[in-house]
């Protein structure tokens, strides 16, 4: 394992260019430097120290220096799992239910990103439990070196006592909540893509978590 220390400005710069959960440090830097994709195993970028400022207010970036761990990870298999295509009526049902949630008066007046985050996750699970379960267990959502969802609090606490796990209401799942609004949106996007939901819905939800 290799450890590097970066200052806050560099941390925020790298984090702002993350395009998916579990994206490797090599992937990010190669994209920023316009280098060709490497054919060798990459290393995953993982935060190992959650700063006191972010722990106190997870909706905003911290203002202290950050540490990253670079851990070697195995190359992805060239054989991707076959994803069962969801019937159109199932997708439409999920979209309608999620829109009911985000267009509700309670959601519109909610100011805490974590409450909105949990409300959307609950809606996704209740409309399609099987699809939700498959989506959150995928590498795209869980990442290569960090667990974001689990069936119990202990599993998430084992990954770090700072993760602030919360149970997703009316579901058997728990999720970490110590991240900022942008990271919450990346997690939601991964789940919704895994459930084969349309980009239009994802973009509408993005507006509640990321201000351009």
From Swiss-Prot:
The region called Interaction with DNA is annotated at 113-114, 144-148
User: InterPro entries from the entry?
Assistant: Arc_rbn_hlx_hlx, Ribbon_hlx_hlx, SeqA, SeqA_DNA-bd_C, SeqA_DNA-bd_C_sf, SeqA_N
Kindly give the SUPFAM superfamilies that the UniProt entry links to this protein. Answer: Replication modulator SeqA, C-terminal DNA-binding domain, Ribbon-helix-helix
Coiled-coil ranges per UniProt: none
Which compartment or compartments is the protein found in? Answer: Cytoplasm
Q: Which GO terms fall under biological process for this protein? A: negative regulation of DNA-templated DNA replication initiation; regulation of DNA-templated transcription
Report a single Gene Ontology molecular function: DNA binding
Any one cellular-component term (Gene Ontology) = cytoplasm
Query: Which family does this protein fall into?
Result: Belongs to the SeqA family.
Please give the HAMAP family that the UniProt record associates with this protein. SeqA (MF_00908)
Name this polypeptide is given: Negative modulator of initiation of replication
